[in-house]
Amino acid sequence: MNRWLRLGFACVGSIFLMFALAACKQEETLTKVKVAEVTHSIFYAPLYVAESKGFFKEEGLDVDVNTTWGGDKTMTSLLSNGSDIALVGSETSIYVEAQGAKDPVINFAQLTQTDGTFLVAREDVEHFDWDQLKGKTFLGQRKGGMPQMVGEYVLNKHKIDPHKDIDLIQNIDFANIANAFASGTGEYVQLFEPQASLFEKKGIGHIVASFGEESGEVPYTTFMAKQSYLKKNEDTAVKFTKAIYKAQQWVENHSAKDITDAIKDEFDDTDPDVIETSIERYKKQHSYSPDPLLNEKEWELLQTIMDKSGELPKHIPYNQLVNKEIAEKVTSEK
């Protein structure tokens, strides 16, 4: 009897060992990809959906996402090989190119296609008009970044000179803007979600307008990599883009509640109701790109916005910094 028991335990042990070895082998075959994200935001929901739904692993990728907090740090991480892919505003690739980069940074997959900020007023405004900003203190975003440039573009569109008609504050770090407004600085502020919805819920402020709706479609946040990386790792870039495209389609076809359930673990310090409200706002204004394609019209609007805010170092042709072939290949496959 003992002999049969020992034999049985040995067989069971062998089976477990086989499964363990198979799992290890699968892990070993996954291609590692290091991604630097400019900030950790509900605005990037499709990226987290790709992780939570296993779309990256389906493509044979082990993706490690690291938040690098700011465009400069994100680009430094990419250029110094601290990361393989960066998720950041497309304007950063233009800045790098204008400095004479020997290894250009190429945009290959778009994640968000509108600005993600909202105009929040301290006082509740029943009938908001942009003229109401004139003479008021406006807590803006960092100079040279996409939020600030889009903000100025929209203000100018409404005949408001941001440097003459309002008291513009731009010397507060991105991470401290919301706290500054909550502490009493400014009568208006430009905020991303979920902070905008959270302020409404707490009665700190009131959303009165969307910069994303006002500015039109731009390559606001894009996956990019050095040209040399894309040449050496084209297959990996294609697989990465496939996973993102799956996630984009999933987000496009699911409710804000479903998306919240998929990504809420990424934001465990945020009320799920606030996450859902934030996602609903972004879906309503089509901020989440339904596919990874970055078209030339969006690219040109980006440079128009940069030019009007005085931040465009020089005009860069679309084909010079955009690889459209990867996204086209992925979206054309059945």
From Swiss-Prot:
<keyword id="KW-0449">Lipoprotein</keyword>
<feature type="lipid moiety-binding region" description="N-palmitoyl cysteine">
    <location>
        <position position="24"/>
    </location>
</feature>
<comment type="similarity">
    <text>Belongs to the bacterial solute-binding protein SsuA/TauA family.</text>
</comment>
<keyword id="KW-1003">Cell membrane</keyword>
<dbReference type="GO" id="GO:0009970">
    <property type="term" value="P:cellular response to sulfate starvation"/>
</dbReference>
<dbReference type="GO" id="GO:0005886">
    <property type="term" value="C:plasma membrane"/>
</dbReference>
<keyword id="KW-0472">Membrane</keyword>
<keyword id="KW-0564">Palmitate</keyword>
<feature type="lipid moiety-binding region" description="S-diacylglycerol cysteine">
    <location>
        <position position="24"/>
    </location>
</feature>
<dbReference type="Pfam" id="PF13379">
    <property type="entry name" value="NMT1_2"/>
</dbReference>
<keyword id="KW-0732">Signal</keyword>
<protein>
    <recommendedName>
        <fullName>Putative binding protein YtlA</fullName>
    </recommendedName>
</protein>
<feature type="signal peptide">
    <location>
        <begin position="1"/>
        <end position="23"/>
    </location>
</feature>
